[in-house]
Amino acid sequence: MAAAAAAVNGSLDRLDVHERKAQKSYWEEHSGELNLEAIMLDSRAAELDKEERPEVLSLLPSYEGKSILELGAGIGRFTGELAKTSGHVFAVDFVESVIKKNGSINDHYGNTSFMCADVTSTDLMIEANSIDLIFSNWLLMYLSDEEIDKLVERMVKWLKVGGYIFFRESCFHQTGDTERKFNPTHYREPRFYTKVFKECQTFNQDGTSFKLSLITFKCIGAYVNIKKDQNQICWLWKKVNSSEDGGFQSFLDNVQYKATGILRYERIFGDGYVSTGGAETTKEFVEKLNLKPGQKVLDVGCGIGGGDFYMAEKYGTHVVGIDLSINMIMFALERSIGCKCLVEFEVADCTTKTYPDHMFDVIYSRDTILHIQDKPSLFKSFFKWLKPGGKVLISDYCKSPGKPSEEFATYIKQRGYDLHDVEAYGQMLKNAGFSHVIAEDRTDQFLSVLQKELDKFEKNKDDFLSEFAQEDYDDIVNGWKAKLQRSSAGEQRWGLFVATK
């Protein structure tokens, strides 16, 4: 047994040596000219950098006076920006000419230090619990899976509790147009990185365990704007005590919207959709918005992105889709690859997310805001984010006026919903400042759509069971029948709301 383990370890070590040689050779070839185009491997580097660099910096937590470890620092595209307000930046890169160039550009800040080292090397010794922010941009894609596993564990140990890790990678495929003799880059699916970081757990000397909590996960908007490419993806994680509850996001991803659960829902709602009526109601409702090419749309609770792709492809709009569920955004990003449209996705909590005033022409939300307890505050945010003349369109679960039955109240509590009657819902939009508020009870349409979805689903039972279990089938059928019963009884309602700023 021990001999077998030693043989496996020896084999991995040889693979790691080969990996490091290949990556070093690759970067020595592409760092002959120490300029932006060479480092970004793209002829449009200057154009991309102008939009992308401030975007990346805007995604970071406050680092004023903080200690920053920058891994794979390159010629210092971010080093100088970080040094302007941080306490100290320790920049590391494994190509000597590159890190020397970085030092010559950024040493004058007086709070920077530079080291030529490979991040996988044990020679890189950082004191435990000493770093506030670990930053890397295009680093992990040049490491093997095994090297990433080891590095993540070390990074978590280096971080202070409450400290952050930010990293950005090229996923799925190459983006830069620079010609390459060979390319050892690992263009992974983003779910690989999410899994590795999410599952990492470390312990301090007294046995207390720590994990990483996901704060942000999104594609870089600059690459969507300029190249219509969603493969540039970044993550922001926070080091927390392992006993910390994951909150509502954890409930969504582990209970209501597990990966298999999302795929189940998609089978009844239709390809790309996880909300009532799928493509049919999307087309009907979106038509009410009079969308024009170039307009910017925010989709709150975007799910797996079907409605966003539809708006971007049919109307030429730029759509920003946000959802609290990591699983939803993971599917949306995977499906965006190759679409070549202006759609970007982000894991975000709409109750804490901020946008500049007057940023969007339309805010769109389908059967999502039922999860939000403080709707008045959210609607005030919507009002601020919209341009004058902008529209909001919301479909959502509602209830009848008055006190719900004991059974319906239990259902609402179990799901964590906050439901209002249609009139009260519309009044909240008016109170937030909106004009021309249309509040329609669409329960009859809801019943019709539910029945149509159920009939089609039952007809395709054998097809569904070829991929899913009988239990999954029963859950869907029973869930739809229960919704039909609650809505037929007049308890559960479905509202459509359109309003203008």
Swiss-Prot record:
Catalyzed reactions: phosphoethanolamine + S-adenosyl-L-methionine = N-methylethanolamine phosphate + S-adenosyl-L-homocysteine + H(+); N-methylethanolamine phosphate + S-adenosyl-L-methionine = N,N-dimethylethanolamine phosphate + S-adenosyl-L-homocysteine + H(+); N,N-dimethylethanolamine phosphate + S-adenosyl-L-methionine = phosphocholine + S-adenosyl-L-homocysteine + H(+)
Residues holding N-methylethanolamine phosphate: Q256, Y257, Y265, Y397, Y411, R415, G416, Y417, K483
Induction comment from the UniProt entry of this chain: Induced by salt stress. Down-regulated by high temperature.
Residues binding S-adenosyl-L-homocysteine: G72, R77, D93, D118, V119, N137, V274, S275, G301, D323, D349, C350, R366
GO biological process: methylation; phosphatidylcholine biosynthetic process
Alphabetized Pfam families for the sequence: Methyltransf_25 (PF13649), Methyltransf_31 (PF13847)
Entry's family note: Belongs to the class I-like SAM-binding methyltransferase superfamily. PEAMT family.
Protein's name in the database: Phosphoethanolamine N-methyltransferase 1
